[in-house]
C-alpha cells in the first residue's frame, strides 16, 4: 500500500494499492492491483446465511474486488461485485460511454462502476 488511504474494516489480501482511497469494509483479493482509484466500500459484510444464498444467486461473486483484477483510474461505488481477472483500465481511452445495463459508465475518461453492480470474471473495460 503506497500513497493511499484505507478505511476501517477492510479485508486486504496480498495485493497492490497505489494512490487510491479504499472505503469502509472493502474486500480486495489476492493479486489485485488498484491504482488511482476510489473504492466506496460496502454497506455490510456478506456473512449471514441469507447473504450466502444471495451470493450463490449472483454467480458466486462476493462484494469486493476479485483475484488478479487490475483497476486503474476508476470509481467503484458501494457493494460492487467484481469477479476474478477483471481489467478496468480504459486502455482505448474512451471518454464517454453509457453502459449502465452492464454495470458501469464512462465520463471524462473515468470508469465508474455503479452501486450493487456485478462485473463477471474476465470482464475487460
Curated annotation (Swiss-Prot):
Main location: plastid
Cellular component terms (Gene Ontology): amyloplast; chloroplast
Documented activity regulation: Activated by 3'phosphoglycerate, inhibited by orthophosphate. Allosteric regulation.
Residue ranges the record marks as coiled coil: none
GO biological process, one term: glycogen biosynthetic process
EC number(s) from the headed UniProt entry: 2.7.7.27
Enzyme superclass (EC): transferase
Localization (cell): Plastid, Chloroplast; Plastid, Amyloplast
Catalytic activity: alpha-D-glucose 1-phosphate + ATP + H(+) = ADP-alpha-D-glucose + diphosphate
Superkingdom of this protein's organism: Eukaryota
SUPFAM superfamilies named in the record: Trimeric LpxA-like enzymes
Summary of subunit composition and partner proteins: Heterotetramer.
Cited function: This protein plays a role in synthesis of starch. It catalyzes the synthesis of the activated glycosyl donor, ADP-glucose from Glc-1-P and ATP.
The family this protein is said to belong to: Belongs to the bacterial/plant glucose-1-phosphate adenylyltransferase family.
PANTHER family from the UniProt entry: GLUCOSE-1-PHOSPHATE ADENYLYLTRANSFERASE LARGE SUBUNIT 1, CHLOROPLASTIC-RELATED, GLUCOSE-1-PHOSPHATE ADENYLYLTRANSFERASE-RELATED
Protein name: Glucose-1-phosphate adenylyltransferase small subunit
Organism: Zea mays
